[in-house]
Amino acid sequence: GALTIACAKGNPQGEMVGIDRWGKEYASFNKSLCESNAAAEEVKNTCFLSGNAVLLDFPDESFDAVTSNYVYHNIARADKQALLMETLRVLKKGGVFAIHDLMSPTRYGNMQMFVERLKEQGYEQVELIDTTKGMFMSPKEAKWLMLRGSALIVGKK
């Protein structure tokens, strides 16, 4: 809920939708907690829904922007590039994306090839940014925090 709330605060004219799968190992996080946090921040332009990133329950091109922060590496047995494509499916033409995760080759495969494939499909300004080289942390911090492979993929559909 924190990313949704931060986006809502920074974009008060828009409606922010936060998607999560609560329960099981994430039992301490739930929809009502997200809603309470939004209320505490006096943010009204949010909506929190339970969902599955593997198959998003939204029509194609539903959103102006999509974001995710350290989520997909937690989804076991899922093809991470397929998860990214499912996320991009719900992004409107002209919409922007920023997805931050542990994008090591063992988890995500060849992300440089993925970036090139997106560009071939017409996506613009696509960049894969290594966030362990001073953007958010140093390489030493990334190793210590077990965040090797941390990267941000951004672009425009």
Question: PLM features: what roles do these ranges have?
Answer:
Residues 17-18, 94-101:
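Conserved beta-strand signature within the Rossmann-like core of class I S-adenosyl-L-methionine
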Residues 119-124, 135-157:
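Core SAM-dependent methyltransferase catalytic element
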Residues 81-93:
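A short glycine-rich, Lys/Arg-flanked "PGG" loop and its adjoining helix->strand segment in the class I
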Residues 11, 75-77, 91-93:
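Helix-to-beta-strand junctions that scaffold the AdoMet/dcAdoMet cofactor pocket
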Residues 24, 98-120:
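Conserved class I S-adenosyl-L-methionine
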Residues 42-53:
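Conserved SAM-binding strand-loop segment of SAM-dependent methyltransferases
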